[in-house]
Amino acid sequence: MKVIASAPAKVILFGEHSVVYGKPAIAAAIDLRTFVEAELIREKKIRIEAHDIKVPGLTVSFSENEIYFETDYGKAAEVLSYVREAINLVLEEADKKNVGIKVSITSQIPVGAGLGSSAAVAVATIGAVSKLLGLELSKEEIAKMGHKTELLVQGASSGIDPTVSAIGGFIFYEKGKFEHLPFMELPIVVGYTGSSGPTKELVAMVRKRYEEMPELIVPILEAMGKVVEKAKDVILSNVDKEEKFERLGVLMNINHGLLDALGVSTKKLSELVYAARVAGALGAKITGAGGGGCMYALAPNKQREVATAIRIAGGTPMITEISREGLKIEEVIK
């Protein structure tokens, strides 16, 4: 028997950094997916094959007879840790120890870009292996197991990434609680800078500024929280689609300005954001921790133009949409 499952990437639409201080955030699944194929094998071992784990921005240097790989391949290897822990959790849940499983991974999600590649591979693995072993788990249960996988591998996790990846659509997150928002189409373009931001260092930097200058930083964080609430109101409102796009675009630009004020933007991120806006995006902002990683732009009827502008500005564009579905069982072959 063989099972193929897939799980989507995510973007933080609004509220990164301020979420650390108890403010809400909105995240959404996007149509870039990780596919995991799981099958039972005779050998009593776990075999993991990674056919296509994307590590964008490959840099190679040549010096006399030596070749230096400058890209961090540790990030690709780290993905395998999530797969291993996810399989172990499912085996534990199914109470099956001496079983042989082969897992094959292919992915459209770049690793280390802040798009939730680790959560997607964990969720898809849990989905495929649990189905293979006859475990009937709800998407909420799979999200919780995905969260547990992240905690085991990285030691800390809000649970946003695996929840979005398992359930799909829009998720409103506040103080550890999740609310599924109604689905709406968002024609977006994600732009990758080619390098990942140092999340821990950036969070620590914001914390330092918060402690040193609370009278300046607290109002910024409060404003960010209000942007998220306003964005939620727009998504829930009955205004037409075009009006929603306009309002969300304005809120994206405000949120980006506030993130810039915190000091988490970079020259490259700003170049991609402004290139997207000039090309016709209604809004563009950092998604994730900043310091590198990705931005995204809301570009109804302008996705190709915005993608071209991002490429010319030195980024890697990915034209995508919000994914209504989270985890999907693509195929079961008996």
UniProtKB/Swiss-Prot annotation:
It is an enzyme of class 2 (transferase). Gene3D superfamilies: 3.30.230.10, GHMP kinase, C-terminal domain (3.30.70.890). GO terms for biological process: isopentenyl diphosphate biosynthetic process, mevalonate pathway. GO terms for cellular component: cytosol. Keywords: ATP-binding, Cytoplasm, Isoprene biosynthesis, Kinase, Lipid biosynthesis, Lipid metabolism, Magnesium, Nucleotide-binding, Transferase. InterPro entries: GHMP_kinase_C_dom (IPR013750), GHMP_kinase_C_sf (IPR036554), GHMP_kinase_N_dom (IPR006204), GHMP_knse_ATP-bd_CS (IPR006203), Mev_gal_kin (IPR006205), Mevalonate_kinase_arc (IPR022937), Ribosomal_Su5_D2-typ_SF (IPR020568), Ribsml_uS5_D2-typ_fold_subgr (IPR014721). Disulfide bonds: none annotated. It is found in: Cytoplasm. Its cofactor is Mg(2+). Signal peptide: none annotated. Its main location: cytoplasm. ATP binds at residues 110-120. It comes from the Archaea. Belongs to the GHMP kinase family. Mevalonate kinase subfamily. Catalyzes the phosphorylation of (R)-mevalonate (MVA) to (R)-mevalonate 5-phosphate (MVAP). Functions in the mevalonate (MVA) pathway leading to isopentenyl diphosphate (IPP), a key precursor for the biosynthesis of isoprenoid compounds such as archaeal membrane lipids. Homodimer. This is Mevalonate kinase. The lineage of its organism: Archaea, Methanobacteriati, Methanobacteriota, Thermococci, Thermococcales.
